[in-house]
Amino acid sequence: MSFTISTSFLQPLEISNLKSSPITSKSKVTSTSIVCSGSTDEKINNADGKSSLKALSAALALSSILVSSTVPALPASADISGLTPCKESKQFAKREKQSLKKLESSLKLYAPDSAPALAIKATMEKTKRRFDNYGKQGLLCGSDGLPHLIVSGDQRHWGEFITPGILFLYIAGWIGWVGRSYLIAIRDEKKPTQKEIIIDVPLATKLLFRGFSWPVAAYREYLNGELIDPTV
């Protein structure tokens, strides 16, 4: 896109031989054309935009390099602030020694082959096994030497809280679903209260095994509108 603007300029006066001749002026009118091209402006704007974008990307790259060079890399084991792996914790090892020492002092009070002595020995073996498992499973201990459960959702620590939590919810839902099914099954009996006091074992056993699939059954009843009693 282009357009032309015509303008005229008045030339300055020509003064020659001021002393001997009068001032003569000549005005020369000249025509000048100014051509403005829209495509040229667009090219200039695009070039300016590209150059500014390059400058911005270069600044971001430089800032990321500076930040990465100034922030120290954290050790792989110290993934949670203030916690260390239990197998490397001195306080954790100290607690294990103290627990075993107390059991050994109690063991001296009984005869070697007596029942209390055998029970204490079994407890000592369980204590050793428990501390070994804490170290092998990668649990993290604090400054007190006690294992800390990580509940932030980190996949590396799912076995500490997420998995047991889901298992707990499943078992609790299973028990509740079986109890609900039992109450629904006996509500049409002549004496339903009597069967609540004295459990019908064959019926309860049958419902107990059906309850393993309670999430699917609950979802099916929810879709059918049978999960919630509308009269309540």
Curated annotation (Swiss-Prot):
Q: Where is the transit peptide?
A: 1-78
Subcellular location(s): the record lists:
Plastid, Chloroplast thylakoid lumen
Q: What Gene Ontology terms for biological process does this UniProt record contain?
A: photosynthesis
Predominant place of localization: plastid
Q: Which UniProt keywords apply?
A: Chloroplast, Photosynthesis, Photosystem I, Plastid, Thylakoid, Transit peptide
Superkingdom of the source? Eukaryota
Ranges annotated as spanning the membrane:
none
Respond yes or no to whether keyword Cell inner membrane is given for this record: no
By sequence similarity, the record places it as follows: Belongs to the PsaF family.
The free-text function statement in the UniProt record for this protein reads: Probably participates in efficiency of electron transfer from plastocyanin to P700 (or cytochrome c553 in algae and cyanobacteria). This plastocyanin-docking protein contributes to the specific association of plastocyanin to PSI.
Name of the protein in question: Photosystem I reaction center subunit III, chloroplastic
Q: What is the lineage of its organism?
A: Eukaryota, Viridiplantae, Streptophyta, Embryophyta, Tracheophyta
Per the record, the gene is PSAF
